[in-house]
């Protein structure tokens, strides 16, 4: 059985992983959802140490799963934790030749849906429903709205992360994502990661709306 370290995105807290954690446990896996806001951090390196401090000591060669805007942290976290696999869940994939900040400034709508530009779902409930949880049933939606929280330090996109070397990667995308353009994530997964690219009939938060399906994918990752 595998150990999973779950990294929340920029618009949810760690409790957003609760449904997926339950599904992983049914398959005998252990998982921990870290809180990136648990301690102050001024750099990506400090943030990686915040993550490491919350991972149990007996988690060896874990699978690191990061969602959405915290994708740029994956390489550094994987290196620090000596991860066995990286999973990019509807996540931003950094480029070695330019920072994500530079890429976003030069061509924002090549990465993001044009509707998403300028929106903040952490202060606007209709925006949270429309962009993050539009594929949820009512019960799930009510719960999901309670997990919304802003975490968006400016330094997150301002530097180039280290290369992932030979670490296996899997990219999971929602074909109805209203935040990140699926066409961009497909290109980035292939050209920047050489990753296996898997699509789900979901929006931007498949761990919320499709936890069983996400758990099935994670359960089948190579050991």
Segments predicted by a language model, with ranges:
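Conserved alpha/beta-hydrolase fold motif
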Residues: 64-65, 86, 171
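Conserved HGGG/HGGXW glycine-rich cap/lid loop of the alpha/beta-hydrolase fold
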Residues: 2-40
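Conserved serine/cysteine hydrolase catalytic core
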Residues: 151-212, 216
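Conserved alpha/beta-hydrolase catalytic His-Asp/Glu region
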Residues: 119-163
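Gly/Ala-rich beta-loop-alpha elbow adjacent to hydrolase catalytic centers
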Residues: 65-74
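Flexible "cap/lid" loop of the alpha/beta hydrolase fold
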Residues: 79-122, 155-156, 181
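Short beta-to-alpha linker loops that shape the active-site pocket of alpha/beta-hydrolase fold enzymes
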Residues: 35-39, 92, 203
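Active-site loop/oxyanion-hole signature of alpha/beta-hydrolase fold enzymes
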Residues: 30-63, 78, 101-109
């Amino acid at each position: 059985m595998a150990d999973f370290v779950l990294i929340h995105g920029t618009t949810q807290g760690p409790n957003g992983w609760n449904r997926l954690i339950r599904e992983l446990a049914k398959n005998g896996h252990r998982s921990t959802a870290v809180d990136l806001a648990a301690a102050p951090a001024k750099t990506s390196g400090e943030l990686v140490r915040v993550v490491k401090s919350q991972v149990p000591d007996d988690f060896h060669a874990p699978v690191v799963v990061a969602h959405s805007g915290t994708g740029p942290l994956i390489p550094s976290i994987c290196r620090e934790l000596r991860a066995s696999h990286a999973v990019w869940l509807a996540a931003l994939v950094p480029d070695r030749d330019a920072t994500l900040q530079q890429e976003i400034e030069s061509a924002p709508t090549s990465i993001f849906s044009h509707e998403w530009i300028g929106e903040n779902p952490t202060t606007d409930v209709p925006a949270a429903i429309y962009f993050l949880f539009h594929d949820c049933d009512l019960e799930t939606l009510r719960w999901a709205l309670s997990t919304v929280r802003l975490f968006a330090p400016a330094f997150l996109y301002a530097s180039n992360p280290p290369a992932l070397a030979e670490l296996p990667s899997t990219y999971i995308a929602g074909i109805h994502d209203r935040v990140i353009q699926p066409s961009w994530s497909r290109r980035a997964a292939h050209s920047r990661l050489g990753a296996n690219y898997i699509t789900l009939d979901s929006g931007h938060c498949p761990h919320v709306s499709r936890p069983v399906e996400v758990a099935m994918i994670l359960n089948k990752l190579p050991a």
